[in-house]
């Protein structure tokens, strides 16, 4: 496989380029009989859509999804679901000046050396534009998980550049362009305005959470649930680090505090992030992502061209000054895809397993 498919039973194959006629995905393995309409998918795509605030790319794509197959009379048929999103606002001429050179920090250099050819328009296959089909597929997984288990997925930004964002409430997240869990985002708006004027970009940190995940999802060793979550999240453009639960903070913890005590009332903590031995505990799945600064910026930078000669690169076009601002719905989608895939795998192998004692509560705190 050439790395364009995520999942084993619930498998999502992504296709297209940033400035091609369309992008999309094919979902294989979705169970039959689930109610599904384009509106279910569109609601999630609208959360990720570009051009929604002055702090993201001004490329104005409607991201209208079309269901081409796999749904009949409003229900999934069990056959592959093909989803299409047409590109309508490309400006390929903006990239003519970098067609023969490489943007520092971008995939231009590695794509060219790997394939011997690259599409410079909007980053081609390496563009964050390709996260739209991921969100579309995630919407399908999200609906199935909610109906089957009551799983809820959510994400928020916890850091913008060097500015840490305190957690106030999940209720604030849908009401500001940063997906920030705070009521007042004026400080972050000013920060982004100054960044744009300086012709620069910044990174971000995100928190991603899944609630009501059943006990038992995940496989031992190489297909651990947390391993597959990390694998999926690293497929999100610009992600450079993934933590599960306490993550790297575990280094400074001791066994007496890191291990989540089990009581008849529930778990006393969740340093494990909802996964033990690669298998879900029934607690909240907690994931944290580190996202690097956008590599496409208007500030001049030193680089080389395809002939190995020194050159100066200035990126034109329309770009997100912080990829992390629109990453929350993408991260939720990736987590949904992984969870649905593992839920179907678990059902196939262990669906008949019945425990005499019910699982303990996720938490009694």
Curated annotation (Swiss-Prot):
GO CC aspect terms: cytosol
Keywords in alphabetical order: Amino-acid biosynthesis, Aromatic amino acid biosynthesis, FAD, Flavoprotein, FMN, Lyase, NADP
Chemical reaction(s) catalysed: 5-O-(1-carboxyvinyl)-3-phosphoshikimate = chorismate + phosphate
Cofactor(s) of this protein: FMNH2
Chain sites annotated for binding NADP(+): 48, 54
Residues involved in FMN binding: 125-127, 237-238, 277, 292-296, 318
Keyword flag Cell membrane: no
Record GO biological process: amino acid biosynthetic process; aromatic amino acid family biosynthetic process; chorismate biosynthetic process
Cofactor note: Reduced FMN (FMNH(2)).
Pathway(s) the chain acts in: Metabolic intermediate biosynthesis; chorismate biosynthesis; chorismate from D-erythrose 4-phosphate and phosphoenolpyruvate: step 7/7
Molecular function in Gene Ontology: chorismate synthase activity; FMN binding
Annotated InterPro entries: Chorismate_synth, Chorismate_synth_AroC_sf, Chorismate_synthase_CS
Enzyme class, UniProt record, top EC level: lyase
Keyword set includes Transport: no
EC number: 4.2.3.5
Subunit structure, interactors included: Homotetramer.
Family that this chain belongs to: Belongs to the chorismate synthase family.
Protein task: This reaction introduces a second double bond into the aromatic ring system.
Descriptive protein name: Chorismate synthase
GN (gene name): aroC
């Amino acid at each position: 496989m050439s790395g364009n498919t995520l999942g084993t039973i619930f498998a999502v194959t992504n296709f297209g380029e940033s400035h091609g006629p369309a992008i999309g995905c094919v979902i294989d393995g979705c169970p039959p009989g689930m109610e599904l309409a384009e509106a279910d998918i569109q609601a999630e795509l609208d959360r990720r859509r570009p051009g929604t605030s002055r702090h993201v790319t001004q490329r104005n794509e409607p991201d209208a999804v079309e269901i081409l197959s796999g749904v009949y009379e409003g229900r999934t048929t069990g056959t592959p679901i093909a989803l299409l999103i047409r590109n309508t606002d490309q400006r390929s001429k903006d990239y003519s000046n970098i067609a023969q050179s490489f943007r520092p920090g971008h995939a231009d250099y590695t794509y060219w050396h790997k394939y011997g050819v690259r599409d410079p328009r909007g980053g081609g296959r390496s563009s964050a534009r390709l996260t739209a089909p991921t969100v579309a597929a995630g919407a399908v997984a999200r609906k199935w998980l909610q109906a089957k288990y009551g799983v809820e997925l959510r994400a928020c930004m916890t850091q913008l550049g060097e500015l840490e964002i305190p957690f106030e409430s999940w209720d604030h997240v849908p009401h500001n362009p940063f997906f920030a869990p705070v009521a007042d985002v004026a400080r972050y708006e000013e920060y982004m305005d100054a960044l744009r004027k300086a012709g620069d970009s910044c990174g971000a940190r995100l928190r991603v959470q899944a609630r009501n995940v059943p006990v038992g999802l995940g496989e031992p060793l190489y297909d651990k649930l947390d391993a597959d979550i990390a694998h999926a999240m690293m497929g999100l453009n610009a992600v450079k680090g993934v933590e599960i639960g306490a993550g790297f903070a575990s280094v400074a913890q001791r066994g007496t505090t890191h291990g989540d005590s089990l009581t008849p009332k529930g778990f006393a903590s969740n340093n494990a992030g909802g996964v033990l031995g690669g298998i879900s505990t029934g607690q909240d799945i907690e994931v944290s992502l580190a996202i690097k600064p956008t590599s496409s910026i208007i500030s001049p930078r030193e680089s080389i061209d395809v002939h190995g000669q020194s050159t100066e690169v200035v990126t034109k076009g329309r770009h997100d000054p912080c990829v992390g601002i629109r990453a929350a719905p993408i991260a939720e989608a990736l987590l949904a895809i992984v969870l649905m895939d593992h839920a179907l795998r678990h059902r196939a192998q262990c669906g008949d397993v019945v425990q005499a004692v019910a699982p303990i509560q996720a938490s009694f705190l």
